[in-house]
Amino acid sequence: MIEIQTSVGELFDKISILSIKKQKIVDVEKLKNIEKELVTLSEKAELLKSIDQESFHSFMDNLIQVNTKLWETEDRIRILEKNQSFNEEFIVLARDVYFNNDKRFEIKSSVNKFYNSDIVEEKQYEKYI
Protein backbone atom coordinates (compact mmCIF):
# COMPACT_ATOMS: atom_id res chain seq x y z
CA MET A 1 0.00 0.00 0.00
CA ILE A 2 1.16 3.54 -0.68
CA GLU A 3 0.06 6.58 1.23
CA ILE A 4 -0.55 9.94 -0.39
CA GLN A 5 -1.38 13.35 0.91
CA THR A 6 -4.76 14.67 -0.13
CA SER A 7 -7.17 17.38 0.86
CA VAL A 8 -9.45 16.86 3.83
CA GLY A 9 -12.43 17.36 1.50
CA GLU A 10 -11.18 14.56 -0.73
CA LEU A 11 -10.85 12.27 2.30
CA PHE A 12 -14.44 13.04 3.32
CA ASP A 13 -15.63 12.51 -0.26
CA LYS A 14 -13.89 9.13 -0.53
CA ILE A 15 -15.33 7.96 2.80
CA SER A 16 -18.83 9.06 1.74
CA ILE A 17 -18.54 7.17 -1.56
CA LEU A 18 -17.28 4.04 0.18
CA SER A 19 -20.24 4.27 2.60
CA ILE A 20 -22.61 4.37 -0.37
CA LYS A 21 -20.83 1.46 -2.07
CA LYS A 22 -21.16 -0.53 1.14
CA GLN A 23 -24.95 -0.07 0.92
CA LYS A 24 -25.36 -0.59 -2.84
CA ILE A 25 -22.89 -3.32 -3.80
CA VAL A 26 -23.81 -6.93 -3.06
CA ASP A 27 -20.76 -8.84 -4.31
CA VAL A 28 -19.09 -10.30 -1.21
CA GLU A 29 -15.52 -10.01 -2.53
CA LYS A 30 -16.05 -6.38 -3.54
CA LEU A 31 -17.58 -5.65 -0.14
CA LYS A 32 -14.46 -7.00 1.60
CA ASN A 33 -12.29 -4.56 -0.35
CA ILE A 34 -14.72 -1.70 0.25
CA GLU A 35 -14.82 -2.40 3.98
CA LYS A 36 -11.02 -2.60 4.21
CA GLU A 37 -10.61 0.75 2.46
CA LEU A 38 -13.43 2.35 4.44
CA VAL A 39 -11.94 1.26 7.77
CA THR A 40 -8.47 2.49 6.76
CA LEU A 41 -9.70 5.92 5.66
CA SER A 42 -12.12 6.27 8.57
CA GLU A 43 -9.23 5.72 10.97
CA LYS A 44 -7.43 8.64 9.31
CA ALA A 45 -10.53 10.80 9.78
CA GLU A 46 -10.98 10.07 13.51
CA LEU A 47 -8.85 13.04 14.55
CA LEU A 48 -11.03 15.33 12.43
CA LYS A 49 -14.16 13.91 14.00
CA SER A 50 -12.77 14.63 17.47
CA ILE A 51 -12.32 18.33 16.58
CA ASP A 52 -16.05 18.88 16.01
CA GLN A 53 -18.37 15.89 15.74
CA GLU A 54 -21.40 17.91 14.68
CA SER A 55 -19.61 19.55 11.75
CA PHE A 56 -17.95 16.26 10.80
CA HIS A 57 -21.31 14.51 10.57
CA SER A 58 -22.96 17.43 8.79
CA PHE A 59 -20.28 17.52 6.08
CA MET A 60 -20.37 13.73 5.74
CA ASP A 61 -24.18 13.64 5.53
CA ASN A 62 -24.17 16.34 2.84
CA LEU A 63 -21.57 14.47 0.79
CA ILE A 64 -23.43 11.18 1.16
CA GLN A 65 -26.60 12.90 -0.02
CA VAL A 66 -25.03 14.46 -3.13
CA ASN A 67 -22.97 11.37 -3.97
CA THR A 68 -26.05 9.14 -3.63
CA LYS A 69 -27.88 11.43 -6.04
CA LEU A 70 -24.93 11.18 -8.46
CA TRP A 71 -24.89 7.38 -8.13
CA GLU A 72 -28.62 7.11 -8.87
CA THR A 73 -28.44 9.62 -11.73
CA GLU A 74 -25.54 7.83 -13.38
CA ASP A 75 -27.27 4.45 -12.98
CA ARG A 76 -30.34 5.83 -14.75
CA ILE A 77 -28.22 7.42 -17.51
CA ARG A 78 -26.52 4.06 -18.14
CA ILE A 79 -29.91 2.37 -18.55
CA LEU A 80 -31.03 5.04 -21.00
CA GLU A 81 -27.71 4.76 -22.85
CA LYS A 82 -28.06 0.98 -23.07
CA ASN A 83 -31.54 1.44 -24.56
CA GLN A 84 -30.32 4.23 -26.86
CA SER A 85 -32.98 6.50 -25.28
CA PHE A 86 -31.47 9.93 -25.77
CA ASN A 87 -34.67 11.72 -24.82
CA GLU A 88 -35.55 14.64 -22.57
CA GLU A 89 -34.98 12.55 -19.44
CA PHE A 90 -31.45 11.72 -20.64
CA ILE A 91 -30.68 15.41 -21.16
CA VAL A 92 -32.04 16.38 -17.74
CA LEU A 93 -30.06 13.62 -16.04
CA ALA A 94 -26.86 14.49 -17.90
CA ARG A 95 -27.21 18.08 -16.73
CA ASP A 96 -27.93 16.89 -13.18
CA VAL A 97 -24.52 15.19 -13.14
CA TYR A 98 -22.62 18.44 -13.45
CA PHE A 99 -25.04 20.37 -11.22
CA ASN A 100 -24.50 17.79 -8.48
CA ASN A 101 -20.75 17.64 -9.10
CA ASP A 102 -20.71 21.41 -8.55
CA LYS A 103 -22.56 20.92 -5.23
CA ARG A 104 -20.09 18.20 -4.33
CA PHE A 105 -17.16 20.52 -5.05
CA GLU A 106 -18.73 23.25 -2.88
CA ILE A 107 -19.09 20.85 0.04
CA LYS A 108 -15.51 19.58 -0.35
CA SER A 109 -14.27 23.18 -0.47
CA SER A 110 -16.21 23.98 2.71
CA VAL A 111 -14.62 20.96 4.40
CA ASN A 112 -11.17 22.13 3.31
CA LYS A 113 -11.79 25.62 4.67
CA PHE A 114 -13.29 24.38 7.94
CA TYR A 115 -10.35 22.07 8.64
CA ASN A 116 -7.74 24.45 7.17
CA SER A 117 -6.53 21.80 4.72
CA ASP A 118 -3.00 22.36 3.40
CA ILE A 119 -4.00 20.75 0.11
CA VAL A 120 -7.09 22.01 -1.68
CA GLU A 121 -8.82 21.07 -4.91
CA GLU A 122 -9.26 23.69 -7.60
CA LYS A 123 -11.58 23.60 -10.60
CA GLN A 124 -12.40 25.88 -13.46
CA TYR A 125 -15.29 25.43 -15.83
CA GLU A 126 -17.23 27.54 -18.26
CA LYS A 127 -19.94 29.42 -16.35
CA TYR A 128 -23.39 28.15 -17.29
CA ILE A 129 -25.62 30.15 -14.95
What name fits each language-model region?
Residues 1-129:
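Extended, charge-rich alpha-helical interface modules
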